[in-house]
């Protein structure tokens, strides 16, 4: 029997969907993440923005039209926020954000198990694995609905994470979660977890982190890893102190820049990426200019920008919203500034040597990512780790030649 699992939203959703797929495979199901004819469909939804919820509903309708008689199981943040929005789609069962472990059990109950044979070839090992270390968030930023849907922080036992790292066949591991900065297993914080991973030769990369967790202890622990990818996705949201206060972000522009400087002290070639919201409630032109200017001051290598989307149930929902035109114009300017910052970051690193883990071959070039997450293209078919030298900007990254010296 065949199951198709669709995923919308964040890396945590991807990890949780992968767990559902693995469990189904272990029970004999053939699984896929592409739209095709199947016996059942699972949709892991997102609710971070109105658009994400709309896409979730749209996907339900698309699956229903494609295969109207197959059972559809919906889970995730959008169904946690409002499960009723999916009932019109003829959905078999609806689960919240913290009920995803029940999806496979429900499928087993409905189908009475599965006695079909497992596929006779090994599952492909991906080059990058995402390991979830915690769930939930206690920050309650004024614009964010996720803490209400995911709940308070719950951290996985450190020993379980260590065992998963040991067992993981992928050469690169990304530590992920809703708010990994809040990781705490009986007093063992993120720095303690990093120290416990210093045995592994795998490349370790961090998911999105918050300002408060950046300190000497964490950075020293990261330097102790055998292969750390110094790419820090340090969430910003705004470069304006007034907007940061309204967002309930608990740091100032100056404090954020101090954290960036501390990172560069320990990792001079670090890549710092970030998120910025365009057009938050009450954002003045001066506030917005502060967000634009910090892109250069912080030396970001990449900026993920998006327009503010008011979410019901958050404190910002009742605040006066800016017009769609203003938000759209500001978003465009942020995206342009972010693109220029990324181009600058790449150009400054041409001629330098990096280690790339090969991921894909398109018939002409093998591609993979540097420690700082520059996508690199090397002519010819290659595998494993490559020592390369960046030569010039190319496609969505840089071309490179093999340099084994």
Predicted regions and their residues:
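Short flexible coil/turn linkers enriched for glycine and charged/polar residues
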Residues: 124-126, 137-139, 228, 238, ...
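Proteins enriched for Cys/Gly/acidic motifs involved in redox and nucleic-acid/cofactor modification
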Residues: 1-182, 217-220, 232, 254-265, ...
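Glycine-centered loop/turn positions within well-structured domains
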Residues: 101, 139, 151, 181, ...
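Active-site proximal loops enriched in glycine and acidic residues that flank catalytic Cys/His/Asp
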Residues: 177, 208, 236-238, 274-278, ...
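Alpha-helix N-cap/loop-to-helix initiation residues
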Residues: 13, 49-52, 79, 211, ...
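Terminal RNA-binding accessory module
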Residues: 318-405
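Conserved SAM/AdoMet-binding glycine-rich loop
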Residues: 72, 81, 169-285, 296
């Amino acid at each position: 029997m065949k199951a198709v699992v669709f995923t919308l939203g964040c890396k945590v959703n991807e990890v949780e969907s992968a767990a559902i797929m693995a469990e189904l495979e272990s029970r004999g199901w053939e699984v896929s993440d592409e739209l095709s004819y199947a016996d059942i469909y699972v949709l892991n939804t997102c609710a971070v923005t109105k658009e994400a919820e709309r896409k979730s509903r749209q996907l339900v309708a698309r699956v229903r039209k494609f295969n109207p008689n197959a059972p559809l199981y919906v889970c995730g943040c959008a169904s946690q926020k409002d499960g009723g929005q999916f009932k019109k789609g003829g959905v078999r069962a609806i689960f919240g954000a913290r009920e995803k472990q029940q999806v496979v059990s429900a499928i087993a109950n409905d189908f009475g198990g599965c006695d079909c044979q497992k596929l006779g070839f090994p599952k492909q090992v991906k080059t990058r694995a995402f390991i979830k270390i915690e769930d939930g968030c206690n920050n309650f930023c004024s614009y964010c609905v996720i803490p209400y849907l995911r709940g308070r922080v719950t951290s996985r036992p450190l020993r379980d994470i260590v065992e998963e790292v040991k067992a993981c066949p992928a050469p690169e591991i990304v530590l992920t979660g809703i708010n990994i900065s809040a990781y705490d297993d009986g007093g063992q914080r993120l720095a303690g977890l990093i120290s416990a991973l210093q045995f592994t030769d795998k490349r370790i990369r961090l998911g999105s982190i918050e300002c408060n967790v950046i300190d000497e202890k964490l950075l020293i622990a990261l330097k102790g890893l055998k292969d750390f990818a110094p790419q820090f996705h340090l969430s910003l949201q705004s470069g304006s102190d007034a907007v940061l206060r309204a967002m309930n972000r608990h740091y100032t522009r100056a404090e954020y820049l101090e954290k960036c400087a501390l990172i560069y002290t320990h990792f001079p070639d670090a890549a710092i990426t970030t998120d910025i919201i365009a057009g938050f409630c009450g954002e003045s032109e001066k506030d917005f200019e502060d967000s634009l200017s910090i892109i250069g001051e912080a030396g970001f290598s990449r900026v993920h920008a998006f327009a503010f989307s008011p979410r019901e149930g958050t404190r910002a929902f009742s605040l006066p919203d800016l017009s769609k035109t203003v938000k759209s114009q500001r978003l465009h300017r942020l995206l342009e500034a972010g693109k220029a910052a990324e181009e600058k970051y790449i150009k400054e690193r041409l001629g330098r040597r990096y280690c790339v883990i090969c991921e894909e071959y398109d018939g002409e070039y093998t591609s993979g990512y540097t420690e700082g997450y520059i996508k690199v293209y090397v002519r010819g078919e290659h595998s494993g780790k490559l020592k390369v030298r960046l030569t010039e900007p190319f496609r969505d990254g840089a071309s490179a030649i093999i340099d084994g010296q």
